[in-house]
């Protein structure tokens, strides 16, 4: 079936309207009318071929929310009319250790929502900057937020799970001191989630202008990471630090803030590598630096349910489909609080 979308035909061209083809629903498929799609910084990197392997036409978008309009005859979990979401994963091998553990995000054959090989036309997946999507029911997520919050739920499908998964894995909660480095699309979700989990949350920023905003998001304390005295006041005190900053920076500034056995987890994907950290800062206190990538389907559903229970959504700015190129330029300038979301109804305007 032919539908409307927005994508790019090359790395050097702006995004533009295009027609794409979606498969007809199979026995286990769910067909979703997309209401809103979040704009992730990785969309920009991929569509401009700043990350290797982009294939064109490229239709980005992996923060998808909408309503079920049709299901295959073997679908058991969903029915037409249900509010649902699709995140970064639309398929995986389903039988490896990672898939059996519900960690499809680490499956070696995980299929991303866009720019991954697929038997469907045109040979690679096309994302949520489009009217509809057809997905196997295993990778569809139920949304329990009220309809009026649906647009602000969209970024939870990437920014939400990217921060929730490491916070849960490293057991953020009451009695734990948790740092969140960066107050952007990822960081603002990390602050909200860590606060809701009951941790003592310290936000790190290089911008004095973000100090009050971080407190409003739920931070108990805010530190200007360029202020040596403020940083020194927190030496050897953190159980866990969630580092959301993608730009290369000095990791040693933050590893020294960890307690013995503390961990700093990186979730920002840098275009160029970070400088190697000072190993003695790690071995002298058995500190660790780790990484984390989105989350599996069961954990993503858990995150959505947690957010619905605690009234958590992203802080967003709604845009029309014809404003995506402008939104990309604004993202590069850091001119967004904190996530753009496309109103997909405007694809037909």
UniProtKB/Swiss-Prot annotation:
Cofactor needs: Zn(2+)
InterPro entries to which the protein is assigned, alphabetical: ADH-like_C (IPR013149), ADH-like_N (IPR013154), ADH_Zn_CS (IPR002328), CAD-like (IPR047109), D-isomer_DH_CS1 (IPR029752), GroES-like_sf (IPR011032), NAD(P)-bd_dom_sf (IPR036291), PKS_ER (IPR020843)
Reactions performed catalytically: a primary alcohol + NADP(+) = an aldehyde + NADPH + H(+)
Gene3D superfamilies reported for this sequence: Medium-chain alcohol dehydrogenases, catalytic domain, NAD(P)-binding Rossmann-like Domain
Cofactor binding, per record: Binds 2 Zn(2+) ions per subunit.
Binding, Zn(2+) 1: 40, 62, 158
UniProt: Zn(2+) 2 binding residues: 93, 96, 99, 107
Top EC class for this record: oxidoreductase
Disulfide bond positions: none
EC number: 1.1.1.2
Function: Catalyzes the reduction of a wide range of aldehydes into their corresponding alcohols. Has a strong preference for NADPH over NADH as the electron donor. Cannot use a ketone as substrate. Is a major source of NADPH-dependent aldehyde reductase activity in E.coli. The in vivo functions of YahK has yet to be determined.
Alphabetical UniProt keywords: Metal-binding, NADP, Oxidoreductase, Zinc
GO molecular function: alcohol dehydrogenase (NADP+) activity; oxidoreductase activity, acting on the CH-OH group of donors, NAD or NADP as acceptor; zinc ion binding
SUPFAM superfamilies on file: GroES-like, NAD(P)-binding Rossmann-fold domains
Keyword Metal-binding among UniProt keywords: yes
Taxonomic lineage: Bacteria, Pseudomonadati, Pseudomonadota, Gammaproteobacteria, Enterobacterales
Temperature-activity profile: Shows a constant increase in activity until 60 degrees Celsius using butyraldehyde as substrate.
Family the entry assigns: Belongs to the zinc-containing alcohol dehydrogenase family.
PANTHER family linked: ALDEHYDE REDUCTASE
Name of this protein: Aldehyde reductase YahK
């Amino acid at each position: 079936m032919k539908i409307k979308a927005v994508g790019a035909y090359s790395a050097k061209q702006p995004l533009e309207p295009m027609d794409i083809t979606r498969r007809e629903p199979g026995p286990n498929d769910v067909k979703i009318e997309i209401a809103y799609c979040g704009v992730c910084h990785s969309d920009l990197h991929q569509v401009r071929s700043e990350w290797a392997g982009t294939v064109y036409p490229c239709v980005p978008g992996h923060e998808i929310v909408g309503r079920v309009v049709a299901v295959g005859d073997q679908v058991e979990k969903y029915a037409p009319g249900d509010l649902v979401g699709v995140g970064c994963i639309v398929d995986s091998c389903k039988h490896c250790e990672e898939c059996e553990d519900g960690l499809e995000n680490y499956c070696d054959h995980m299929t991303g929502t866009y720019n991954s090989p697929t038997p469907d036309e045109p040979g690679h997946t096309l994302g949520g900057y489009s009217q509809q999507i057809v997905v196997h029911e295993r990778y569809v997520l139920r949304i329990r937020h009220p309809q009026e919050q649906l647009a602000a739920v969209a970024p939870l499908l990437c920014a939400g799970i990217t921060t929730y998964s490491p916070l849960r894995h490293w057991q953020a909660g009451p009695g734990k001191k948790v740092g969140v480095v960066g107050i952007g699309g990822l960081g603002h979700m990390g602050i909200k989630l860590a606060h809701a989990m009951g941790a003592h949350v310290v936000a790190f920023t290089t911008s004095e202008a973000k100090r009050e905003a971080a407190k409003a998001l739920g931070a108990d304390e805010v530190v200007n990471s360029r202020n040596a005295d403020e940083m020194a006041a927190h030496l050897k005190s953190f159980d866990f630090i969630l580092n959301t900053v993608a730009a290369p920076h000095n990791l040693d500034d933050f590893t020294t803030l960890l307690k013995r056995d503390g961990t700093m987890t990186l979730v920002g994907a840098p275009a160029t590598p970070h400088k190697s950290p000072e190993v003695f800062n790690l071995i002298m206190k058995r500190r660790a630096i780790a990484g984390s990538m989105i989350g599996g389907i069961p954990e993503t559903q858990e995150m959505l349910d947690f957010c619905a229970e605690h009234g958590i959504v992203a802080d967003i700015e709604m845009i029309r489909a014809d404003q995506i190129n402008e939104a990309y330029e604004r993202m590069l300038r850091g001119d967004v609080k904190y996530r753009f979301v496309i109103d997909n109804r405007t694809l037909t305007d």
